[in-house]
Regions:
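Active-site metal-binding motif and surrounding structural segment of the metallo-beta-lactamase
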Residues: 1-7
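Conserved, mostly hydrophobic/aromatic
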Residues: 3, 14, 72, 79, ...
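Histidine-centered catalytic micro-motifs
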Residues: 8-20, 189-198
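Short capping/connector residues at structural and topological boundaries
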Residues: 11-12, 50-51, 165
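Alpha-helix initiation and N-capping motif
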Residues: 15, 19, 35-41, 210-213
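Short, solvent-exposed beta-strand-terminating loops
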Residues: 15-30, 113-123
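Alpha-helical scaffold segments that flank or form the walls of functional sites
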Residues: 24-111, 141-157
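Metal-coordinating catalytic core of metallo-dependent amide/deamination hydrolases
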Residues: 84-213
């Protein structure tokens, strides 16, 4: 019996679980005399992404998801883009790191939409940076294989669904964004960063002639 107000569980529609371990690492006091902006934050994020092992990703995600549940979130969409090992090589199990996320979610009891992210370039028409090596799909077909592996993995877990994801318009060739959209069926989630910074909008206009929409 409910004797007061009741609210439905919230949904976190955009999570990067491994970044929970960055708390306090990317903020600088003005007296530090160092950059303190999105780009310095990204350097900190890359540094972390190039250190975390599968067991770390699972433990960090479990800690984060426990906190989400404690604060009323019952479903999380995980925008998951670390897929490869520290050297940028594929794991024997392509879904290795996605499965670590799924195991963390099931262990704490939160519903999960896992979105393996397609990432292939370092900017509009630019090659990927070495710091991005754990994120990359080597081709469109390579990403489809990754997504298929994650879908197969997800069948082992309760309350786990899978979507398609593009990191950003700068992170994937435009023709591949369009092609991936054709693979979406029914209510399959499709997730993308439209733009993270003003510079990204400016670069998009310079490269395509239009804003990211």
């Amino acid at each position: 019996k409910c004797t007061g107000f009741a609210l439905p569980g919230f949904q976190n529609a955009h999570s990067h679980a491994f970044q929970y371990a960055m708390a306090g690492l990317a903020e600088l006091h003005p007296t530090a005399m160092k950059k303190n902006d999105f780009w310095s934050w990204r350097e900190s994020m890359y540094a972390l992404a190039l250190k975390v092992q599968p067991e770390h990703i699972e433990a960090i995600a479990a800690m984060l998801y426990k906190e989400m549940l404690r604060h009323g979130y019952t479903h999380v969409a995980e925008f998951h883009y670390i897929h490869r090992d520290l050297n940028g090589s594929s794991y024997e199990n392509k879904a290795e790191l996605s499965e670590r996320i799924a195991r963390a979610a099931q262990s704490v009891g939160i519903n999960l939409t896992i979105i393996p992210i397609y990432y292939e370039q370092g900017g509009f028409g630019l090659p990927p940076q070495k710091e991005q090596r754990r994120f990359l799909s080597s081709s469109f077909e390579d990403y489809l294989e990754l997504n298929a592996a994650v879908k197969t993995m997800a069948t082992k877990y309760e309350n786990c669904e899978v979507g398609f994801g593009i990191h950003s318009m700068r992170g994937v060739a435009l023709e591949n964004i369009i092609e991936l959209a054709k693979h979406r069926t029914g209510n399959t989630p499709f997730h993308i960063h439209i733009a993270e910074q003003t510079k990204e909008i400016e670069d998009c206009i310079a490269f395509t002639g239009i804003r990211p929409t």
